[in-house]
């Protein structure tokens, strides 16, 4: 096995004229006409191949409408689901004073103070 120190000068000598005017193979490659890019049809279609050129794209999302014609999940009636009842706990939903762990300082972990503060 050859040493790296010996191999580097050999490779530099072998490829000294690579990608230059003296490289005949590269010059032939440059003379070729450019290849056309691949054509990918219907790359953003959701339903498969039989949905070509649908005019109104808004109709694709009809099944996601809720009961009162709002956008959301099917039959999304979360607003009137509980009818004012609590979720099963009697704990207050908001604390009187906000709880911030003080181990990271005023601006939190990995946050910077506002520009010009330093």
Swiss-Prot record:
Q: Where is this region: RNA-binding?
A: 56-118
Gene Ontology molecular function: any one: enzyme activator activity
Its name, as the record gives it, is RNA guanine-N7 methyltransferase activating subunit
Q: Does the keyword RNA-binding apply?
A: yes
Where the record places motif RNMT-activating domain is 36-42
Could you tell me which residues carry N-acetylthreonine?
A: 2
| The entry's keywords | Acetylation, Methylation, mRNA capping, mRNA processing, Nucleus, Phosphoprotein, RNA-binding
Q: Where in the cell is it found?
A: Nucleus
Per the entry, what this protein does is:
Regulatory subunit of the mRNA-capping methyltransferase RNMT:RAMAC complex that methylates the N7 position of the added guanosine to the 5'-cap structure of mRNAs. Promotes the recruitment of the methyl donor, S-adenosyl-L-methionine, to RNMT. Regulates RNMT expression by a post-transcriptional stabilizing mechanism. Binds RNA.
Modified-residue entries (Phosphoserine), positions: 36, 86
Q: How does it assemble?
A: Interacts with RNMT; this interaction enhances mRNA binding and cap methyltransferase activity.
Q: Which cysteines are joined by disulfide bonds?
A: none
Comp. bias (Low complexity): 45-56, 98-109
The keyword Phosphoprotein appears for this protein: yes
Q: Which gene specifies this protein's sequence?
A: RAMAC
Could you give a single Gene Ontology term from the biological process aspect?
7-methylguanosine mRNA capping
Alphabetical GO CC annotations of the entry are: mRNA cap methyltransferase RNMT:RAMAC complex; mRNA capping enzyme complex; nucleus
The Swiss-Prot or TrEMBL record describes its family as follows: Belongs to the RAM family.
Tell me which InterPro entries the record gives. Answer: RAMAC
Write down which residues bear the modification named Omega-N-methylarginine.
85
Residue ranges for the region (Disordered) are 29-118
């Amino acid at each position: 096995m050859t040493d790296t120190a010996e191999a580097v000068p050999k490779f530099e000598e072998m490829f000294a004229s690579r990608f230059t005017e003296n490289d005949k193979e590269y010059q032939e490659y440059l003379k070729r006409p450019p290849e056309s890019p691949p054509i990918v049809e219907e790359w953003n279609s959701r339903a498969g191949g039989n949905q070509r050129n649908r005019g109104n794209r808004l109709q694709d999302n009809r099944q996601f409408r809720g009961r009162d014609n709002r956008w959301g999940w099917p039959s999304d009636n979360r607003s009137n689901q509980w009818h004012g009842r609590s979720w099963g706990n009697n704990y207050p939903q908001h604390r009187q004073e906000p709880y911030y762990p003080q181990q990271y300082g005023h601006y939190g972990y990995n946050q910077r103070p506002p520009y010009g503060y330093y």
